[in-house]
């Protein structure tokens, strides 16, 4: 056969293939996709753990039915309760479907201490979060989660500086609330709560992160909020797809996030260069009291390879913005709805005002100190009760299996690459642990502390930042969320500023009832499109 004739074989074969729009063509494409998915599941995906039951599937099942996966997506809360009461509370592990093709291995709470004691080369938290967040696609590298030193600084440096930044935060809250809630003392204003709180939290958190004036730059703040939305979409969509397809969506989201990072760098890079120069050449000058400065000082000591890598430092700011803004905005929305919704029964707003007037002064001229804010036991209770019921995620204490021979405490082998976790929402609403567990009782935890004090007993460990196997909003153990102390401080300051300076209520059409949260798969979301009414209180 000649070379010319052999080159004609390709077009001839293509001509013989069925058209893609024909029934045979559609069937062929479907068959190819099914074969690809089968190969992905058998070769690329982490196998199902042997011997661990699959919820709502017959004994011995090795994959989830489409029905069970649909139930996870559309009605996950009952599935979580079933997993908790029928398996986990009985000391048994169980597998749940996850988003897309994922599977989730849940261990019982009685194995948590043992699980957390395993070294990182056996069970790794950073690698687990890197996979859950799909950060290698969104930010181009998993180091921003696996080696998240920008977050550890919050724990070890920023928390010590809270006293210094407290009144700066008070000034920032005045600035942003005057703009978002208004200053009218005569007329009620209807607030679209979600976008309003998003901007409030973005500005307040940015005062901690990058300081003035950048924290008031609306383009910068919107950039942070838009990037956070891309992170959530990438984690859900890319993480839920078969591994063979992830490069397509992951690359797309990497490009979208990259464009946001490029925009952010026009603000961050000049600021970084200025701060690095000051730290190196003018150490005698007063230092800005914000996270960016602490990051630079840490990087000069411990990460010299990154300190003048402007792209890497910018991406760490992006990662920190997500941690500082996203969950806090959700919890502040829940907090305000819960305070207003419980006011008729518990007189919540007046009780909080009394405590804050006593600790902060009845006018707005005094300084806000760390000790005063930490003494707000009733505000602490109101906030802890809100996150008990409003945690965004239904699971915590994530770990990724890093070895080939791992077995759980009770002997179940889990394949390398398995993601395991512990259920949180059903444990945090268990009636055996919390009386009327699904009810929002604002002073549930402060009552427990006050009753213990009246008996001369030690206060129970029920503060906002306290974690336990039955209270996992911030995780548990040495890897618990390092930023929870800052979130605690921030939420108390926001709550104090609102109740001291504004009257708040629901619109009349709500008839005094708090709109319910809604679940998307296992994500517990505040109600969308919710409004509140606000009016500035006249100064005494």
What does each model-found stretch correspond to?
Residues 422-461:
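Conserved cytochrome P450 K-helix/beta-meander segment immediately N-terminal to the heme-binding cysteine loop
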Residues 2-19, 521-540:
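C-terminal helix/juxtamembrane-tail motif
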Residues 4-145, 470:
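N-terminal membrane-proximal hinge/A-helix region immediately C-terminal to the signal-anchor transmembrane segment
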Residues 98-101, 107-210:
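Charged/polar low-complexity intrinsically disordered regions
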Residues 467, 478, 484-522:
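Cytochrome P450 heme-binding "Cys pocket" and the immediately downstream C-terminal segment
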Residues 328-355, 482-502:
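Cytochrome P450 catalytic-core helices
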């Amino acid at each position: 056969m000649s070379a010319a004739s052999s080159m004609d074989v390709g077009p001839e074969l293509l001509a013989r293939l069925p058209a893609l729009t024909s029934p045979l063509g559609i069937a062929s494409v479907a068959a190819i996709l099914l074969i690809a998915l089968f190969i992905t599941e058998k070769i690329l995906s982490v196998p199902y753990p042997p011997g661990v039951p699959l919820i709502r599937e017959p004994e011995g099942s090795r994959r989830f039915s489409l029905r069970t996966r649909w139930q996870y997506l559309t009605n996950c809360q009952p599935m979580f309760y079933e997993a908790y009461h029928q398996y986990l509370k009985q000391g048994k592990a169980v597998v749940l479907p996850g988003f897309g093709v994922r599977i989730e291995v849940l261990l019982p709470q009685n194995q948590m201490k043992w699980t957390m004691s395993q070294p990182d080369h056996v069970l790794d938290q950073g690698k687990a979060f890197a996979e859950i967040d799909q950060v290698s696609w969104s930010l181009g590298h998993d180091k921003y989660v696996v080696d998240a030193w920008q977050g550890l600084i919050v724990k070890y440096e920023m928390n010590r500086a809270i006293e210094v930044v407290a009144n700066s935060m008070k000034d920032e809250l005045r600035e942003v609330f005057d703009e978002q809630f208004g200053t009218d003392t005569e007329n009620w204003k209807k607030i679209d709560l979600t976008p309003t709180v998003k901007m409030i939290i973005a500005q307040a958190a940015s005062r901690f992160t990058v300081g003035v004036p950048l924290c008031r730059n609306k383009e910068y703040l919107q950039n942070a909020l838009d990037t956070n939305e891309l992170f959530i979409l990438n984690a859900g969509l890319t993480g839920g797809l078969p591994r063979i397809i992830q490069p397509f969506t992951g690359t797309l989201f990497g490009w979208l996030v990259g464009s946001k990072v490029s925009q952010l760098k026009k603000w961050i890079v000049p600021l970084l260069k200025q701060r690095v120069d000051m730290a190196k050449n003018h150490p005698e000058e007063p230092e800005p009291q914000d996270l960016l400065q602490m990051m630079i000082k840490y990087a000069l000591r411990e990460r010299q390879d990154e300190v003048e890598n402007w792209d890497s430092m910018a991406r760490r700011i992006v990662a920190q913005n997500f941690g500082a803004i996203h969950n806090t905005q959700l919890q502040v929305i829940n907090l305000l709805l819960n305070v207003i919704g419980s006011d008729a029964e518990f007189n919540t707003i007046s009780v909080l005002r009394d405590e804050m007037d006593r600790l902060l002064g009845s006018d707005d001229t005094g300084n806000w100190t760390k000790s005063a804010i930490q003494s707000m036991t009733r505000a602490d209770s109101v906030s802890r009760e809100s996150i008990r019921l409003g945690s965004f995620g239904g699971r915590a204490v994530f770990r990724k299996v890093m070895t080939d021979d791992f077995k759980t405490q009770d002997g179940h082998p889990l394949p390398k690459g398995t993601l395991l976790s512990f259920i949180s929402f059903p444990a945090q609403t268990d009636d055996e642990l919390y009386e009327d567990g699904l009810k929002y009782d604002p002073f549930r935890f402060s009552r427990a502390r006050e009753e213990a004090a009246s008996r001369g007993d030690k206060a129970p460990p029920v503060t906002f930042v306290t974690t336990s196997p039955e209270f996992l909003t911030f995780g548990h153990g040495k890897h618990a969320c390092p930023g929870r102390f800052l979130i605690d401080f921030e939420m108390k300051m926001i709550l104090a500023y609102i109740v001291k300076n504004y009257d708040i209520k629901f619109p009349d059409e709500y008839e005094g009832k708090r709109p319910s949260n809604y679940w998307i798969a296992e994500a517990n979301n505040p109600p969308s499109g919710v409004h509140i009414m606000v009016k500035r209180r006249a100064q005494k």
